[in-house]
């Protein structure tokens, strides 16, 4: 889905057939650290969430990419592609049902020969419950031992949580690093063993026609906001004109 018109068609089809349209937002549903962060917030460890900062850097791995990867009309743009994951997390952690795109930008700063590739993007958004900043890119250097140093910082009124999802550049081994800071402590948690309930819940939803894995309205809202951010984005660098 790369346009709002396509999203409208999906919504109409789901409504007509009673189908479930669900997306595996893997930066939430496949990351145990995110599950643990949600538990910490539910425990009141950082107060009320008022902002998220989501960073989604990726490695380009140019030799592995098909031709369509460098054609904006086919892949939909970097905000539709990667930033949708961060929008999902913003809505989820702030408890927002809707949001406004304050500003968005896409750019090609490092690949001037591929004018259809957006290698950088950012979004500022806000809702009645909080604000969010998102940065995504295709700049992960080869020296990093994984495809991207994905991070999420969740700011609350009484503290904050930082997730280093796939690597800790400070030297801790493994993945799913959680840091919690509040009025009582500055704590490190290895969240590798936290649950990943999305797929089990989705199967339950398919069988019982429920919405435990992810509300349908939430899924469609993430798609809508990503598509709107993409459509209104300021274009910088060596991007082809549209």
Feature-to-residue mapping (PLM):
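Active-site loop of classical SDR/Rossmann-like NAD(P)-dependent oxidoreductases
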Residues: 189-200
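Alpha-helical elements of Rossmann-like donor-binding domains used by nucleotide-donor carbohydrate transfer enzymes
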Residues: 9, 32-39, 89, 120-122, ...
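Beta-strand-loop-alpha-helix segment that lines the small-molecule cofactor/substrate pocket
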Residues: 1-29, 44
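NAD(P)-dependent dehydrogenases' Rossmann-like dinucleotide-binding region
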Residues: 22-29, 43-64, 78, 82-86, ...
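Contiguous beta-strand/loop segments that form the cofactor/metal-binding neighborhood of enzyme cores
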Residues: 88-169, 199-208
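Short glycine/proline- and charge-enriched loop/turn segments
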Residues: 66-74, 179-184
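C-terminal helix-rich "cap/oligomerization" subdomain common to oxidoreductases
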Residues: 6-11, 20, 201-242
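Short polybasic amphipathic segments
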Residues: 152, 169-183
């Amino acid at each position: 889905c790369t346009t709002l018109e396509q999203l409208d068609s999906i919504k109409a089809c789901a409504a007509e057939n009673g189908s479930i349209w669900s997306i595996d937002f893997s930066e939430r549903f496949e990351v145990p650290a995110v599950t643990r962060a949600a538990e910490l917030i539910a425990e009141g460890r950082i107060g009320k969430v008022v902002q998220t900062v989501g960073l989604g850097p990726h490695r380009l791995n140019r030799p592995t990419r098909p031709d369509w990867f460098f054609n904006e009309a086919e892949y939909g743009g970097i905000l539709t592609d990667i930033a949708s994951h961060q929008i999902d997390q913003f809505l989820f952690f702030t408890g927002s049902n809707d949001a406004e795109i304050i500003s968005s930008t896409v750019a090609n700063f490092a690949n001037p020969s591929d004018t259809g590739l957006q290698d950088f993007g950012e979004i500022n958004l806000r809702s009645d419950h909080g604000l969010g900043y998102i940065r995504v890119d295709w700049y992960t250097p080869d020296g990093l031992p994984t495809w991207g140093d994905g991070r999420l910082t969740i700011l609350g009124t009484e503290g904050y949580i930082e997730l280093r999802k796939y690597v800790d550049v400070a030297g801790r081994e493994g993945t799913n690093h959680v840091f919690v800071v509040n009025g009582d402590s500055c704590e490190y948690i290895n969240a590798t063993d936290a649950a990943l309930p999305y797929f089990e819940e989705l199967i339950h939803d398919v069988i019982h026609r429920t919405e435990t894995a992810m509300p349908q309205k939430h899924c469609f809202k993430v798609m809508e906001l990503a598509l709107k951010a993409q459509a209104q984005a300021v274009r910088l660098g060596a991007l082809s004109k549209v």
